[in-house]
């Protein structure tokens, strides 16, 4: 009878079993990834690929999904520009329709276009005024944090804020010393 160590048992029995379980888990995850990408892409071609091709295709697909999010974030960061572009496209469309409509009064078209231009200008001025007010408010908030409010007796000069108010000094009493 031959004596077998735990290491030999592990190498003969456990290690192959653990490797089979690991491969089965990997294959299950690859199948899940394959079906998920096929559903999201709307393309069943990935289902017929081998594992390496499927992984490459999944990586490419995920990179493509990552790119539009950056574009969407840039669009969200500039809503006013998006609005301006949309408004101008609408104005151009109105102008085109009025020009191509037979029997359209020139005076009516002129007044409509003047009105649309005036509204656009008012919107721009409102946005600029609001931006300026926000800027002023932010700068005032920052500058007022550093300084104490001026008293009514203050002259209003900057030097009033820098110098601390003179504090009354207590009367010095002679200090008792034992010698």
Swiss-Prot record:
Entry-linked PROSITE patterns: BHLH (PS50888), ORANGE (PS51054)
Example of a GO MF term: sequence-specific DNA binding
InterPro entries to which the protein is assigned, alphabetical: bHLH_dom, HES_HEY, HLH_DNA-bd_sf, Orange_dom
Compartmental location: Nucleus
Xref: SUPFAM superfamilies: HLH, helix-loop-helix DNA-binding domain, Orange domain-like
Domain bHLH, residue spans: 10-65
The UniProt record lists the keyword Repressor: yes
Record domain Orange: where: 83-116
Motif (WRPW motif): 176-179
Keyword vocabulary terms for this entry: Developmental protein, Differentiation, DNA-binding, Neurogenesis, Nucleus, Repressor, Transcription, Transcription regulation
Region spans: Disordered: 146-179
A GO term from the CC aspect: nucleus
An individual GO BP term: dendrite morphogenesis
One Pfam short name: Hairy_orange
Assembly information from the UniProt record: Homodimer. Heterodimers with dpn. Transcription repression requires formation of a complex with a corepressor protein (Groucho).
Protein name (Swiss-Prot/TrEMBL): Enhancer of split m8 protein
Organism in which the protein naturally occurs: Drosophila melanogaster
The organism's taxonomic lineage, starting at the top: Eukaryota, Metazoa, Ecdysozoa, Arthropoda, Hexapoda
